[in-house]
C-alpha cells in the first residue's frame, strides 16, 4: 500500500509538472507573440472544419493544378486522405468576399505513415520522430497568390512547431522545388533528384526535408530575406486552432440505456 501511495504521489507530481510546463510554454509563446510586429493581410488562413470549406479547397486545387496539369486537374475531387485523422487542410480566404485564394494539406504520422512513404523508403534518420508532409499546395494567380503562398508556408511552419513536429517532408515538382530549397529545405535523396511519386499520380517529384527545431536559427544565421516576415511578425489572420476534418456521421449507442435512441455525431 505504501508503494502504491508513493507511486500515486509520483504520478501526481509528474502530471502536475507536465501541466505546469505546458502552462509555462503557453505563457512564453504569448509573450513572444506580444513582442512581434503585427501585420494585417487582406485574407485569412484557417483550418477547414466543414465539407463546404473542403470543397473550396478543392476548387483552388483545380485552378492551380490546371495551369500546369489540366488533365490531372479536371479529375481532382475531395480525397479520402483529406479527412484522415492527423490531417489538416489550410484554406486562405479573401476578407472582402470570402473567395478561396489558397490551400495546403498537412498530414502528420501520428496515426498512419505519410503519403510519401507509400512511394519511397525514407532513410533511417527520417523514419523516427514526429513527421509532417505538406501536399496539394494551390494558390490564386497574380501578386495576391504569391503573398498567399508565403503565408501558407509560414502557416506550415507554425503548425509544425505547434504540433511539436521534428521534420517537415515535402515532395515538390519543378519549379516549386526551388522555392523550398530557398527556404533551406534539403534533399532527402540525391541532389536535385526527381522520383516518380505513386501517391501523387506518379508525377516526378523531388523529396526535401526541413528540421523544424532548428529552422529559426538556420534562417537567422543565413540572413534569410524572409526571416523577419516568418519569425518576427505576428499575423493574427493565421488561425491554426485545431479542427476535426472527419465529416462522416458516426452512430453512438448507449448499451446501458437501450431506451435511448442512437445519436449520430459528426466526428
Where are these regions (language model features)?
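Acyl-donor binding region in acyl/amide transferases
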Residues: 112, 117-214
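Charge-rich, low-complexity intrinsically disordered segments
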Residues: 201-267
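Conserved beta-strand in the GNAT
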Residues: 91, 98-108, 116
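Short amphipathic alpha-helix that is part of the acyltransferase structural core
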Residues: 30-79, 89-93
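Short, solvent-exposed loop/turn elements at beta->coil junctions and helix N-caps
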Residues: 74-81, 193-198
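Conserved N-terminal entry element of GNAT/NAT acetyltransferase domains
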Residues: 2-51
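Structured alpha-helical
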Residues: 100, 106, 163, 230, ...
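Short, small/polar residue-rich loop motifs at catalytic or cofactor-binding pockets
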Residues: 84-87
Amino acid at each position: 500500500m505504501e508503494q502504491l501511495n508513493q507511486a500515486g504521489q509520483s504520478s501526481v507530481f509528474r502530471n502536475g509538472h507536465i501541466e505546469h510546463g505546458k502552462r509555462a510554454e503557453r505563457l512564453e509563446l504569448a509573450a513572444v507573440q506580444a513582442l512581434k510586429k503585427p501585420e494585417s493581410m487582406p485574407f485569412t488562413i484557417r483550418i477547414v472544419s466543414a465539407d463546404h470549406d473542403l470543397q473550396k479547397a478543392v476548387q483552388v486545387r483545380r485552378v492551380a493544378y490546371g495551369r500546369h496539369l489540366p488533365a490531372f486537374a479536371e479529375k481532382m475531387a475531395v480525397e479520402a486522405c483529406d479527412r484522415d485523422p492527423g490531417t489538416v487542410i489550410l484554406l486562405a480566404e479573401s476578407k472582402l468576399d470570402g473567395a478561396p485564394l489558397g490551400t495546403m494539406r498537412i498530414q502528420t504520422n501520428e496515426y498512419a505513415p505519410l503519403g510519401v512513404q507509400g512511394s519511397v523508403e525514407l532513410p533511417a534518420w527520417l523514419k523516427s520522430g514526429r513527421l509532417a508532409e505538406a501536399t496539394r499546395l494551390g494558390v490564386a494567380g497574380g501578386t495576391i497568390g504569391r503573398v498567399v503562398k508565403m503565408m501558407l508556408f509560414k502557416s506550415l511552419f507554425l503548425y509544425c512547431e505547434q504540433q511539436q513536429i521534428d521534420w517537415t517532408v515535402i515532395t515538390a515538382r519543378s519549379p516549386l522545388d526551388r522555392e523550398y530549397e530557398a527556404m533551406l529545405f534539403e534533399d532527402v535523396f540525391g541532389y536535385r533528384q526527381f522520383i516518380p511519386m505513386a501517391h501523387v499520380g506518379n508525377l516526378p517529384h523531388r523529396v526535401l526535408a526541413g528540421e523544424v527545431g532548428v529552422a529559426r536559427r538556420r534562417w537567422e544565421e543565413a540572413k534569410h530575406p524572409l526571416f523577419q516576415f516568418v519569425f518576427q511578425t505576428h499575423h493574427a489572420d493565421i488561425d491554426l486552432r485545431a479542427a476535426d476534418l472527419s465529416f462522416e456521421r458516426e452512430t453512438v449507442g448507449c448499451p446501458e440505456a437501450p431506451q435511448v435512441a442512437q445519436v449520430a455525431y459528426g466526428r
